[in-house]
Amino acid sequence: MTKRTLTMLGTGYATATRYYNTCFTIKSDGTTLLVDAGGGNTILNRLEESGTPLDDIHYMYLTHAHTDHVLGAVWVMRMVMQMSRNGVYGGVLHVYGHDKVLSVLEWICRQTLSTKFSALIGSVVMLHEVEDGDSFSVGDMTVTAFDIHSTREKQFGFRARWSDGTTLVCLGDEPYNEATKPYAENAQWLLSEAFCLYADREKFKPYEKHHSTARDAARLAASLNVQNLVLYHTEDKSPDTRKATYTAEAKSEFSGNVFVPDDLESIEINSPKHQ
């Protein structure tokens, strides 16, 4: 059986200081997909600490253009361009995203990187615009992008599928919209934001910020008939208790497996028959 690993490079919300911003890798059959890159060059440290060399990354997916998701991608691209010029990065970095996020990314790169680097956009770094429902291949994964129908910022989640039937769905970092049900229902793995505990909703005001709680995510997972729930994009005021308290709140509403990973924690993505 092919080993598949989800590694959370960061698990925090936009202004977290105790965690890095939410971003992760999916490694499968020798191929690595980087999903978002956080808000700065800490992404380089996180990749290094997770044992992911930059020259192993040839695919990146960006959900949206908020600073805590896209600015780290500038650093990834800059380093790939530099390594390519030095002859230590082979091949191409393929970056997938919707029109808005790719436009923002390219503009920042062309405004802030030297011409010797930005000139490599279109050769060493290829930007691939995806629309709602488009699919593309990353190694042995088929990735389908979908619009999460955010009312705040255009954002795409995705559904990854393997030939053995394993499915992993990323809902982005905003509350679930019923329009995305065809992509999320019956997934083996569901990645959902949980800004805080429902018990702490008065303290953190998640709903006013277009976010949800651990209890909300768990109820959603149960209603969508998923098997495994991964919570991320959280507040950072409870690092010593987060795993236990978020897991307990989610478990009270969802009978499947609940994961509340720390930064740099890896989770093995098993196929349905190995759950």
For each of these PLM feature ranges, what is it?
Residues 2-50, 154-172, 189:
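Conserved beta-strand hairpin/beta-sheet module of binuclear metal-dependent hydrolase folds
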Residues 6, 36, 47, 64, ...:
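Divalent metal-coordination and catalytic microenvironments
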Residues 16-18, 129-199:
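Active-site-proximal loop/helix segment associated with metal-binding centers of metalloenzymes
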Residues 35-38, 57-65, 98, 168-172, ...:
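Active-site neighborhood of phospho(di)ester-bond hydrolases with catalytic His/Asp-centered motifs
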Residues 41-94:
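Active-site metal-binding motif and surrounding structural segment of the metallo-beta-lactamase
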